[in-house]
Amino acid sequence: MDLTAENLGVRRGEDFIFMNISFKLSDGEALVLTGRNGSGKSTLLRTVAGLLRPEQGRVKIAGEGIDAEMRPSEAFHYLGHRNAMKTELTVAENLRFWKDFLGDFPGSTGVAIDEAAAIVGLAGITHLPFGYLSAGQQRRFAMAKLLVAWRPVWILDEPTAALDRAADAMFTDLVKSHLGKGGIVLAATHQPLGLEKAQELQMTGFAGVETWA
């Protein structure tokens, strides 16, 4: 499939945070956003994910299994700074909610909850309340959401911030596997995460200028 952003611009108050942002990604490709704090990286990710409405421009998807009625966000997973998991529910209940709520992209199937737990290195504890877990364990299970409901585009905002090297290595393997299966990754991250060959988009804030590398 193809993910295309055309001339995106987002305003905060009277001023644009950024404008005229365009890019196109196809199967197996990744784009990493760089730039200083406040340059609009998180805002761009949230806009592409459909969580913020752009002042100008649009995001579109095209490819096999995509019809005219499908919203682009139906092809996306968004993993931001928050885990988006209920502390009073068990891990299994949380993952079941996201598996059912998000659903799978047409033609693909997510992995079982127990399998996802094993992949993120935490097999055997999905019966525990999410709130009982350490911060690192909670973050790993938030990453498992990417696995239980299969979607081709991963939008990642500093997904491994403050985690240890083992978690970084685990998530790097997940990202590489996703790209190897033809997935697409759009990320703001200071960690390599298997994205060394990714395209780069430098955000410059109010200047509205982007630089490809």
Swiss-Prot record:
List the coiled-coil residues.
none
- All copies of the ABC transporter domain together span 3-211
- How does this protein sit in the membrane? Peripheral membrane protein
What reaction is this protein's catalytic activity? heme b(in) + ATP + H2O = heme b(out) + ADP + phosphate + H(+)
* Known function: Part of the ABC transporter complex CcmAB involved in the biogenesis of c-type cytochromes; once thought to export heme, this seems not to be the case, but its exact role is uncertain. Responsible for energy coupling to the transport system.
Whom does it interact with, and what assembly results? The complex is composed of two ATP-binding proteins (CcmA) and two transmembrane proteins (CcmB).
Protein name, as recorded: Cytochrome c biogenesis ATP-binding export protein CcmA
**Origin species:** Agrobacterium fabrum (strain C58 / ATCC 33970) (Agrobacterium tumefaciens (strain C58))
